[in-house]
Amino acid sequence: MQAIPFNPARDVIVPRRKEKEGQKLKYLDDDNLKKFLTYLEQLPNTYKNFYDTVLYKTLLATGLRIRECLALKWSDIELKNGTLDVNKTLNIIKEITGPKTKSSIRVIDLDNKTVLMLRLYKARQSQIGKEMGLTYEKVFSNSFDKHIDARMLSFRLVKHLERAGCPRFTFHAFRHTHASILLNAGLPYKEIQIRLGHAKLSMTMDIYSHLSKDNQKNATSFYEKAIEKLKSS
């Protein structure tokens, strides 16, 4: 065989990867969210099920990325004041690193039900720790207070979704669902951006603007009410 004196692929134009603009954002709609939460409430009262339930509900209530959540220590959560400090993340080899971006460093307010749930979870975790001679520092650790593998938790999530009769999705769907709930409740995009830790407001708007269906539908009624108020004044 003889060597070709030129590269035949030199002038080949490699097609650019298409943007994911048309890709559907995965989140739990109202029906599937209700179905999944009902399923969680009916699980046998084992610590493993309680752990999973608290993890899912914490993600849903805060919009945290899964690796931000798995990096949490109890010292990051002020149960008395109802705040959660996001300042680190857990990488794929279970090492603690800095957050994704500077804007990812944030303090999130917790609702009362989530605070109560975390109090109950901490008490149950502490009881198990006493039996094992451990004091748990990490919120979502394994039995020995070591960081847990997110991939194993993903496998458990898939099993729960199948049993609940819900479509399959990843942990990130909880984040999208959180944003969707806040958006349709009327929270401004800027507040959602800060809560999610997005670097730019445009990022939040690009990702979630099409989820504001309720707000879009309400726009006409807001207009009608404004006109009627103007007429009657």
Regions found by a protein language model. Name each.
Residues 1-8, 78-82, 123-132:
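Proline-centered turn/helix-capping motifs that create local helix->coil transitions or kinks
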Residues 4-6, 10-72, 80, 104-105, ...:
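Basic, Lys/Arg- and aromatic-enriched nucleic-acid-binding interface segment
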Residues 15-17, 87-89, 113, 143, ...:
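Generic beta-structure capping elements
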Residues 27, 90-92, 196-222:
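Catalytic-site neighborhood detector that most strongly recognizes the C-terminal catalytic loop/helix
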Residues 38-49, 62, 108, 125-138, ...:
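Short, basic (Lys/Arg/His-rich) helix/loop patches that form interaction surfaces
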Residues 81, 94, 99-105, 112-114, ...:
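C-terminal secondary-structure termini that scaffold catalytic or DNA-interacting sites
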